[in-house]
Curated annotation (Swiss-Prot):
Protein name: Small ribosomal subunit protein uS15
Keywords: Ribonucleoprotein, Ribosomal protein, RNA-binding, rRNA-binding
Cited Pfam families: Ribosomal_S15
GO biological-process terms attached to the record: translation
UniProt family annotation: Belongs to the universal ribosomal protein uS15 family.
Amino acid sequence: MSITAERKKAIVAEYANKVGDTGSPEVQVAVLSERIANLTNHFKFHKKDNHSRRGLLKMVSQRRRLLDYLKGIDQNRYQTLIKKLGLRR
């Protein structure tokens, strides 16, 4: 269900604005998107896992808040990120 340390490092390296950047909205959204994708796959086999579903909903809302923040700060970075991640908005 969770992502490995190597995968997380790869995501951070891909979306970071500078070396060691783990706190930028782009990196946080990318990591959350990976975790959301893993949990979505988990629910295909464990439909009644409501405890994890609550965590998924929290992650989705956190990602939404980060995306709204990024959109307010810099529209171009927001558009680039959602295209790169393949999000619907």
